Regions:
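Short beta-strand element of the alpha/beta-hydrolase
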Residues: 9-18
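Short beta-strand/loop motif that positions the catalytic acidic residue
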Residues: 130, 136-138, 142
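Primarily recognizes the serine-hydrolase "nucleophile elbow" in alpha/beta-hydrolase
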Residues: 63-129
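Conserved alpha/beta-hydrolase
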Residues: 33-50
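The serine-hydrolase catalytic nucleophile loop
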Residues: 19-30
Length: 208
């Protein structure tokens, strides 16, 4: 966990990683959030296997939410989730079940089931039950979640009248925002974190 200076309470962000991690790349992201003025908690899977089903991972992250609620520095009224890679799906699952999650930010996330032969709802099905504002940032060359699927999800979200923003980065691959990921790309990484900071300031920090 990384915490900002000052007595608080501060808005808080739960960071949900993908299959790779947690590692120094995610630790750097937590520290960056603390520099912005947010309590940042990095969730690491405790379930067995490198690529476990979503349900036990979600059950485990509920414990992380419970812990974050116990942190005196964290403002329980201002809670966001950052989902990276498969953590984007877990962010949707968490926001559907926990109304206290006020903002969702997703980096190169939402692996669609047709690509991975995994059972369960598609990301756009999960998103139908989410009311929190959502920012989604994706690379056009993502090999894990094809950009065509993401554009269909954008269309579906707008049809549902959701508060959402989508940003697409030309040439960026899966993992572009995490420094230790093979797909890391400095320029779209900087752009995406600038967007994330703006989105948090607009939809989370200003909440009463």
């Amino acid at each position: 966990m990384a915490t900002p200076d000052g007595a608080g309470p501060h808005p808080a962000v739960l960071i949900l990683r993908g299959v790779v991690g947690p590692d120094d790349g995610y630790t750097e992201i937590a520290r960056r959030l603390a520099e912005w003025g947010y309590v940042a908690l990095l969730h690491g899977w405790k379930v067995r296997g490198a690529n476990p089903p979503d349900a036990p991972v979600y059950d485990d992250l509920k414990g992380a939410l419970t812990f974050l609620r116990s942190v005196s520095l964290a403002d329980q009224r201002r809670l966001a989730v950052f989902g990276f890679c498969r953590g984007g799906v877990h962010a949707l699952m968490a926001a559907r079940a926990h109304e206290e999650i006020r903002v969702i930010v997703v980096f190169h996330g939402f692996a669609f089931r047709s690509a991975h032969s995994q059972p369960g709802a598609q990301p756009y099905d999960l998103a139908e039950g989410v009311n929190a504002p959502m920012l989604v940032m994706h690379g056009t060359e993502d090999e894990q979640a094809p950009v065509a699927d993401m554009r269909r999800m954008e269309t579906r979200m707008r049809e549902l009248g959701k508060v959402c923003e989508f940003r697409f980065y030309d040439g960026a691959r899966h993992g572009f925002a995490v420094r230790t990921h093979p797909g890391y790309d400095e320029h779209p990484a900087k752009q995406s974190f600038d967007e994330a900071k703006r989105f948090l300031e607009t939809h989370l920090r200003r909440l009463d």
